[in-house]
Amino acid sequence: MRSILIGFVLALIVFGCQSKGEKADKVMANKEEFNRILRATGRPGIESVISHLDSTDFYTRPAGNHHTEEGGLVQHSLEVYRIMRLITWTKPSESIVLTALLHDMGKIDYGGWHPWRSVKHLGEWGFQLTEEEGYAIFYHHKAGWRYYIRTLRRNLTIADAISTGWWRIRHKLHLV
């Protein structure tokens, strides 16, 4: 209980002390970084994805139960990307970039269970995922990470769990 209170106070200090201008600057910086990394993949159809994201609240939307501040969704996506780069031990591949950054597209119009919506949105926007990328995004919450054999899915699940703070509650789920 004490650590939760300390975390809450620290979050208030860090996020509560930012002016609206500072928060807007952070959101804009995250948007620019997100788009720059996506464009660097050179994947056909990526401009269509960016165009569709510009017409939504993706860059300003909170991520849900975690990253609840303005711009939390894009912040979480960037964190998942950075974590995947750390745990993959290879040069970041196009698939790592795409699955990390695009795994929560389904939260754009819906805050609940979303993985199938992420894959659906990307397809509707004319963006083609590989089969492995689609499975990684679709299953990044399902069935528990210990069952993932494919590296891409496993690493996306682990990175998402780390970014959301899931590791902080693992003892409550009897997983340690």
Where are the regions a protein language model picked out?
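An active-site-proximal "capping" alpha-helix that borders the catalytic cofactor pocket
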Residues: 80-83, 112-126
